[in-house]
Amino acid sequence: MTNRLILFDFDETYYKHRTNQADIPYLKEMKSLLQNITAKNNVITAILTGSTIESVLQKMSKVNMSYKPQHIFSDLSSKMFTWNNCEYIESDEYKNEVLIEPFLLEDILDILKHVSSKHKVEFIPQRIFRENETLYNFYFYSSGDTHLDKTILEDLSQYSKTRDYTMTFNRCNPLAGDPENAYDINFTPKNAGKLYATKILMNKYGVPKELIIGFGDSGNDEAFLSYLDHAMIMSNSQDEEMKSKFKNTKYPYYKGIYTHVREFIEYENV
């Protein structure tokens, strides 16, 4: 039987930050379905997220997510972890591919300084950065004028390209712990990102696009979802632009994933 792939964004897609008792039956239903199809239907599951592996595992533990996807691509899919012997192990092979070209914080800070001076704006680090990072992320607070925001961010993206760096941005989601009225600014190596991770998995398992379904909720999911034949935006998404571009799930969060994964597996088994 041919392998199939199921790909999930994490925050506010696979994981609901405000999970409550009413959500637990749907969470258990989703878990049971994923366990069954992984064991019986040649299905590979993976999380593609901007969060760190530590953050993902902490949140999964918080709501007792006992099912473990085979792969987690953290830090905007610049790191790959595989479930093996009851723990997630980082892939050195993937790490070497990601860092095949120079990726330096000093270069990124210089890029930001140039655009910051030009537009008289500020880019704020989201955390304390360590050595040899594969993701450098910043916040940019909205000017109150969406058109002006996009002009500044597109300028930053284009200038980054002239410096041989990849920068993406998306509107922040306060439900996922982000600040209000802000944008995520993400710098990753060229060999990284959710689309890159998707193609790596397709090649690794020999899965064609028509046998993949992907779920997301925000702008940083657009590239990989646009690439797939079966792509879903969560109905609980706060991103109206993304909801207008993709098919929306019938239900939010766990119930939505359960419903559409089951439909996808049953359709492919016909």
From Swiss-Prot:
Enzyme class per UniProt: hydrolase
Family annotation (Pfam families): S6PP (PF05116)
GO molecular function annotations of the record: magnesium ion binding; phosphatase activity
Entry-linked InterPro entries: HAD-like_sf (IPR036412), HAD-SF_hydro_IIB (IPR006379), HAD_sf (IPR023214), SPP-like_dom (IPR006380)
EC number: 3.-.-.-
Keyword field: Hydrolase
Entry's Gene Ontology cellular component terms: cytosol
UniProt keyword Disulfide bond present: no
Family membership noted in the UniProt record: Belongs to the HAD-like hydrolase superfamily.
Name of the protein in its database record: Uncharacterized hydrolase SE_0147
Native organism taxonomy: Bacteria, Bacillati, Bacillota, Bacilli, Bacillales
